[in-house]
Curated annotation (Swiss-Prot):
It comes from Escherichia coli (strain K12). Member of the two-component regulatory system UvrY/BarA involved in the regulation of carbon metabolism via the CsrA/CsrB regulatory system. UvrY activates the transcription of the untranslated csrB RNA and of barA, in an autoregulatory loop. Mediates the effects of CsrA on csrB RNA by BarA-dependent and BarA-independent mechanisms. Keywords: Cytoplasm, DNA-binding, Phosphoprotein, Transcription, Transcription regulation, Two-component regulatory system. Residues 143-208 form the HTH luxR-type domain. Residues 167-186 bind DNA. This is Response regulator UvrY. The lineage of its organism: Bacteria, Pseudomonadati, Pseudomonadota, Gammaproteobacteria, Enterobacterales. The modification 4-aspartylphosphate is found at residue 54. GO terms for biological process: phosphorelay signal transduction system; regulation of DNA-templated transcription. SUPFAM superfamilies: C-terminal effector domain of the bipartite response regulators, CheY-like. Disruption phenotype: Inactivation of the gene leads to hydrogen peroxide hypersensitivity.
């Protein structure tokens, strides 16, 4: 039996995935979490084989939660299930310790296949995302996102900023000083040739890394 933890801040999304999996032989949803912090705690105290993880959630978010789970509970396999398919996110997520990467638009059977694949020790990346990643290696000048130059930590902080989180919130959630968070911010601004959080969010929207609704919280 493959024990699965569902992690998403939208209850409706979790309910939908649970319905998909509840009749699948050999797969059991053993728990749910609505934020990265709870997902990390769940994996440390319960028997979990595979985590279906959302990227953008309140708190530390899916990227940092993936890193923490991969470090502390190496046997747990993580599949990032997200609307964000733009380079460089898939590669950064896999580097953080995920075993799989799927779009939330994936067919139910592909979700099942991904769970079984990562449980058996393989990696699973949706074919369209894998093609995009391969193309970026062949023709980087045509496919590379401006965000490809960001480090994993910079990318993580960028996603938190585009959700409207402030420096003090980010520093508390990531156990970094506000000064360190600001250093990452200004480094990002320099790399991306921008001058502030709103401009960062506009750029992220243009490249599919967040949606326009986030601007209302800026």
């Amino acid at each position: 039996m493959i024990n699965v933890l569902l992690v998403d801040d939208h209850e409706l999304v979790r309910a939908g995935i649970r319905r998909i999996l509840e009749d699948i032989k050999g797969i059991k949803v053993v728990g749910e979490a609505s934020c990265g912090e709870d997902a990390v705690k769940w994996c440390r105290t319960n028997a979990v084989d595979v985590v279906l993880m959302d990227m953008s959630m309140p708190g530390i978010g899916g990227l940092e939660a993936t890193r923490k789970i991969a470090r502390s509970t190496a046997d747990v396999k993580i599949i990032m299930l997200t609307v964000h398919t733009e380079n460089p996110l898939p590669a950064k997520v896999m580097q953080a310790g995920a075993a799989g990467y799927l779009s939330k638009g994936a067919a139910p059977q592909e979700v099942v296949s991904a769970i079984r694949s990562v449980y058996s020790g393989q990696r699973y990346i949706a074919s369209d995302i894998a093609q995009q990643m391969a193309l970026s290696q062949i023709e980087p000048e045509k496919t590379e996102s401006p965000f490809a130059s960001l480090s994993e930590r910079e990318l993580q902080i960028m996603l938190m900023i585009t959700k409207g989180q402030k420096v003090n919130e980010i520093s508390e959630q990531l156990n970094l000083s506000p000064k360190t968070v600001n250093s990452y911010r200004y480094r990002m601004f320099s790399k991306l040739n921008i001058h502030g959080d709103v401009e960062l969010t506009h750029l992220a929207i243009r490249h599919g890394l967040c949606n326009a609704e986030t601007l209302s919280s800026q």
